[in-house]
Amino acid sequence: MNKKILFIPLIAFMALAVIFATQLVRNQSGDDPTKLESVLIGKEVPEFRLEDLAEPGKLYDQAVFKGEPLLLNVWATWCPTCYAEHSYLNKLAAQGVKIIGLNYKDDRNKAVGWLNELGNPYLISLFDGNGMLGLDLGVYGAPETFLIDANGVVRYRHVGDVNPTNWASTLEPMYQDLLEEAK
């Protein structure tokens, strides 16, 4: 009986080793767990009515995403990565990149103060205090950035910060393609 008990930890260790090895093989075969697909790719931004971050009572709906290609950047003051990407978003906006901000599950006063202090790269800042639009978009956390075409259709989802590397390699070429399509 005692010998059988000694095998239980060995069996548990072997099971964990198999699970670990399986995950390593999955990651090597291209199944990247950091890539979060969106069911909204190819679909219009979901319907919503949200207030402007700085002007409570001023409402916007999904029509703000129609007319020209743009980025929808999901951000919050509680998000350290959002802080890290913010100066780069300011640079992109200064270069003419159209960006709408979605302030996600945040304190409105802190968010307004953040933009006043760090600069505001957003054409419009939507306030999603309860996270309902974020939920409809499938947001897991902040930051996330969506490429939206001129018809209000989600074309790409980027999880994590927008930085010079991923902007140049992935996001900018896609954004430029959307600008060409819109002509």
Residue ranges, per PLM feature:
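N-terminal targeting signals for export/organelle localization
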Residues: 1-51
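Conserved Rossmann-like nucleotide-binding pocket used by diverse enzymes
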Residues: 46-49, 75, 100, 135
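Structural microenvironment flanking redox-active thiols in thiol-disulfide oxidoreductases
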Residues: 83-119, 129-136
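Short gly/ser/thr-rich secondary-structure transition/capping motifs
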Residues: 29-31, 51-58, 125-128
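Short pre-active-site segment immediately N-terminal to redox-active cysteine/selenocysteine motifs
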Residues: 44, 68-70, 74-78, 141
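A short beta-strand-turn-helix
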Residues: 48-70
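Thiol/disulfide oxidoreductase modules built on the thioredoxin-like
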Residues: 116-121, 128-179
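Hydrophobic beta-strand anchors of alpha/beta hydrolase catalytic cores
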Residues: 71-72, 99, 145
